[in-house]
């Protein structure tokens, strides 16, 4: 199959998305405060209403945190919403894993903003959160296409890689990363594209920052997807292989974006209304890099204004010199030490046939908590 025919098929896959995007652009409005977020879809299960029940509310009217444009996309693609929620949940969990040993640990709060007021600051942490959330949606939608869960997409139609050996078959049902990336762009970016802040304003800079980091998250999933193959043959001889495009494990995506977080570029709004480097001595960021416009707040102490939850009560590692160490995690305030019993399986033995029997052991361990 030549590249032209592949491109035509891809274009057909996303034509409905482009039409929806044009519809949303014509109905944009000024949004001053993002008190709610679509991330909240990851905190509560999404259940499609039973249409035959008298008085049942439409699905999209039940979902909080959606912007006007996202709600319209919800109406057009209701079967996608469960997977958008799954993607948000995946992103939140990965964020919490990657930052589990940092002062800011991606904690959620009990409202539809999900992460609280700290997201109103255009910091490195905010940049990572936007990127990993967008990546989660690409991941979930791409896999749902492959599994036949969505009405507007199916298996990947990516062209055969040129470096694939000739005697290997190409055509297994792969993850549709192309569709997942396109749909995630239309849905996740809808909120930002509805805004109409004055060009060059601080609010406009924040919108550009969000859009850039959303794209960086999508690019991470797209670029890390790779070829997977399965052997066929008598007695596992692997005389034939069938290959397809497969998503990378999401942990790899999280680790990749964490590296981008550590090297994120500090930006400011320029005279032409575009983001530019704060320090021109550095190379400009690529679409895969994260960008931020504000310094991170003090995460050591609880602060209602910035949304920082502080590190009081956080566990720390007494012997570590890293960010999880008690000296850094507790910000010099000191720590309390106490002993607890840790219960775990031990002395496991295999019995024929066929089960494993273990004993339960208790060990007294020291734990340290920041004051």
Curated annotation (Swiss-Prot):
The keyword Ribosomal protein does not apply. GO terms for molecular function: cytokine activity; frizzled binding. Disulfide bonds join 95-106, 145-153, 155-173, 229-243, 231-238, 300-331, 316-326, 330-370, 346-361, 348-358, 353-354. PROSITE patterns: WNT1 (PS00246). Palmitoleoylation is required for efficient binding to frizzled receptors. Depalmitoleoylation leads to Wnt signaling pathway inhibition. GO terms for cellular component: extracellular space. It is found in: Secreted, Extracellular space, Extracellular matrix. Residues 1-28 form the signal peptide. It comes from the Eukaryota. Ligand for members of the frizzled family of seven transmembrane receptors. Probable developmental protein. May be a signaling molecule which affects the development of discrete regions of tissues. Is likely to signal over only few cell diameters. This is Protein Wnt-5b.
